[in-house]
Amino acid sequence: MHKLKLHGFNNLTKSLSFCIYDICYAKSQADRDSYIAYIDEQYNANRLTEILSETCSIIGANILNIARQDYDPQGASVTILVSEEPMDPKDVDNTENPGPLPDSVVAHLDKSHICVHTYPESHPGGGICTFRADIEVSTCGVISPLKALNYLIHKLESDIVTMDYRVRGFTRDVNGMKHYIDHEISSIQNYMTEEVQSQYYMMDVNIYQENLFHTKMMLKRFDLNDYLFNATPEQLSEAEKQEITHLLKKEIQEIYYGRNLPTV
């Protein structure tokens, strides 16, 4: 897409929102309570603030304000307001390619925000525990928040990721013509590294004419040892391992497809 000469400020709003899910199996109620306490500590407001502050550093944004809160009995939320440093729009990379990792600082944001909310929970009797984090990066200006995606996926390793990217509003060029998007995009997947793409099954649902893009990701690799809390596979019988594996895979597939599957 050729460079646009705008009349005034770039008024497009670009928002990336995604949910990440982490699944585990905890056999007893005490283990499930311990998992909730563990994940609540691992992703408390202070830790989330560090992650989001690092995100701001990566994309070159100035932090204006931080609001954070831990909740009782569990969960946390952090919202950071950020602003853009002075920059030349011709230096901005809006091409469809993966964003930076922590060692590559190349972007800026405008009057924008980054926020995260966490939701740990457990099945009342089935041993399944899940942790969900909702993250949103919203920008006004020339920069796409998709440049923060690659870092966050690496930072928050997950079993399932669902993402939505949307561009709202319009900006006007010097001739008065309205533009409803200022960069080319065919899929959110194009902003991920090949390494990430190789690790996940992915599915797109895009509405191009509405500038709405949706991608789901489900981890390909399944190792039971990675999903057990306070236990190891060696402590389980073959029948128990098969049953727990079935429960975990069913839970992962249900969350990925967004529907409950029949019990077999």
Curated annotation (Swiss-Prot):
Q: Which Gene3D superfamilies match?
A: S-adenosylmethionine decarboxylase
- The modified positions for Pyruvic acid (Ser) read 112
Q: Which UniProt keywords apply?
A: Autocatalytic cleavage, Decarboxylase, Lyase, Polyamine biosynthesis, Pyruvate, S-adenosyl-L-methionine, Schiff base, Spermidine biosynthesis, Zymogen
| GO MF, any single term | adenosylmethionine decarboxylase activity
What chemistry does it catalyse, as a reaction equation? S-adenosyl-L-methionine + H(+) = S-adenosyl 3-(methylsulfanyl)propylamine + CO2
Catalytic residues (positions)? 112, 117, 140
What exactly does this protein do? Catalyzes the decarboxylation of S-adenosylmethionine to S-adenosylmethioninamine (dcAdoMet), the propylamine donor required for the synthesis of the polyamines spermine and spermidine from the diamine putrescine.
* Name listed for the protein in its UniProt record: S-adenosylmethionine decarboxylase proenzyme
